[in-house]
């Protein structure tokens, strides 16, 4: 049975004081209401250690928004998985639309990260999704297929148990356009089928992978989304940055 996951992406938001306050609030409230859902938070890199210490021993998992695919080395400005392990972080987000769009991260670059992280016993949250122009030109499935096949190329089947996917309809974020639960379900179903075709025996593996929806998830739409067969949770931005709205997702 697939896990239902609510993952809060704090992005480059919150001061240290705000992040610490939110982490304490999450520790106090979320474990008691999460029930059968897995809760995750992804603070900014500078706040990871503080938040990890606060949530240590709770059911809330702390993840990193990014890292580089290398051990300790001369990569100025980057963070190594080795450094993340030191502070208890074992989940890393890869391929978020903002990193693809603004920092030029390609499917192949994401693949390098994913393979390195999985081999080093991390769980990976891999984000895929199409832009507004790609959707309006009818390229949604083509784009997603490339992101899945190129991003997950060469990954051994034994590592797929540590893989989570998230679908981000970039066209529905900050554009005034809204993806309906049925539109999201259609794409999630396609993603699952694409995974099932990656290698022999992948069909059963694809059925066990949680696929989250990441298009402006809020307390007032989460339940309708979760009713869909292939939507297994949410990758949440703004609503995860206040305890009232984050708690409303559970």
Curated annotation (Swiss-Prot):
Binding annotation for substrate: 9-11, 174, 216, 237-238
Keywords: Cytoplasm, Gluconeogenesis, Glycolysis, Isomerase
Principal localisation: cytoplasm
Catalytic activity: D-glyceraldehyde 3-phosphate = dihydroxyacetone phosphate
GO molecular function: triose-phosphate isomerase activity
Broad class of enzyme this protein falls into: isomerase
The protein's annotated pathway: Carbohydrate biosynthesis; gluconeogenesis; Carbohydrate degradation; glycolysis; D-glyceraldehyde 3-phosphate from glycerone phosphate: step 1/1
EC number: 5.3.1.1
A Gene Ontology BP annotation from the UniProt entry: gluconeogenesis
Function: Involved in the gluconeogenesis. Catalyzes stereospecifically the conversion of dihydroxyacetone phosphate (DHAP) to D-glyceraldehyde-3-phosphate (G3P).
Protein name as catalogued: Triosephosphate isomerase
Species of the source: Leptospira interrogans serogroup Icterohaemorrhagiae serovar copenhageni (strain Fiocruz L1-130)
Lineage: Bacteria, Pseudomonadati, Spirochaetota, Spirochaetia, Leptospirales
Gene transcribed to yield this protein: tpiA
């Amino acid at each position: 049975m697939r896990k239902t996951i609510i993952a809060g992406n704090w992005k480059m938001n919150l001061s240290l004081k705000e992040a610490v306050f939110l982490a304490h609030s999450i520790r106090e409230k979320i474990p008691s209401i999460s029930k059968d859902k897995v809760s995750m938070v992804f603070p900014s890199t500078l706040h990871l250690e503080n938040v990890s210490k606060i949530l240590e021993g709770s059911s809330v998992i702390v993840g990193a928004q990014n890292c580089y695919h290398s051990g300790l080395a001369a990569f100025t400005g980057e963070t190594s998985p080795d450094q993340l392990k030191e502070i208890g972080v074992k989940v890393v987000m890869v391929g978020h639309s903002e990193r693809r769009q603004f920092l030029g991260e390609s499917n192949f670059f994401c693949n390098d990260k994913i393979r390195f992280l999985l081999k080093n016993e991390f769980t990976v949250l891999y984000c895929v999704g199409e832009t507004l122009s790609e959707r309006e030109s009818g390229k949604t499935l083509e784009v997603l297929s490339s992101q899945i096949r190129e991003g997950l190329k060469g990954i051994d089947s034994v590592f797929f148990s540590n893989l989570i996917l998230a679908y981000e309809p970039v066209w529905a974020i900050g554009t005034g356009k809204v993806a309906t639960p049925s539109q999201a379900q259609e794409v999630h179903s396609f993603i699952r089928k694409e995974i099932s075709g990656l290698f022999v025996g992948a069909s059963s593996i694809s059925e066990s992978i949680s696929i989250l929806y990441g298009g402006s998830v809020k307390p007032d739409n989460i339940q309708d989304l979760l009713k869909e067969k292939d939507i297994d949770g949410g990758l949440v931005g703004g609503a995860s940055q206040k305890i009232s709205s984050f708690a409303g997702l559970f």
